[in-house]
Amino acid sequence: LILKEKEYKDLPFVDVVEGDWFYDAVQYARINGFFNGTSETTFAPNGTMTRGMFVTVLGRIAGVDTADYAGQTPFKDVPANMYYAPYVAWAAKHGVTSGMGDGTFSPDGLINREQMATFFVRYFEKFDIDYSTGENITTTPADINKVSSWAQDAVKNLWKQGLLDGIKTDVYAIHDNFAAPTAACDLYDFLSLSPEKIADYLPFL
């Protein structure tokens, strides 16, 4: 997987215009094939992401060969014929996800910010990706006590590196659903924080 940084072209989306805070990130995500819009001409910047969509994005970043996971269904609610199925199988195999704890993955469930943080950290750590930025933020989100126990370390680790922005000052709004523009911006931040680090690990498989 070669990350493209310079091949910027006008976006085809009528609902994303230059000057939008997420414009560059959406452009970056699109030219690298991480995700597309909701149609050929719309991105739906007010839209949210499902868990299936998000794991698909991670799998595309990793350069997953979907043929290697065809027909694998590690969770009872992930049909083998769905677009996200091979990516979910990849994520389960490599410990990026363990599902909901009841044999399901909830692929159509909206992903919230604490789930996003956990996916990212597991993804980085399972493949030994150095996601340090040189930052050493000593504060924690004011709402850290609202974070689920299984997500606490991931949120703290990303926050410490300056890779998580609060909705308000020092508030991460951890249970808010993860919006598509935010996903694009976080991917942009994570994958451009240190290209020389990322390049050594993509693709993994």
Regions found by a protein language model. Name each.
Residues 1-23, 31, 36-52, 59-85, ...:
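Feature responds to low-complexity, polar/acidic, surface-exposed segments characteristic
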Residues 178-182:
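Acidic helix/loop microenvironments that form the catalytic cleft of cell-wall polysaccharide enzymes
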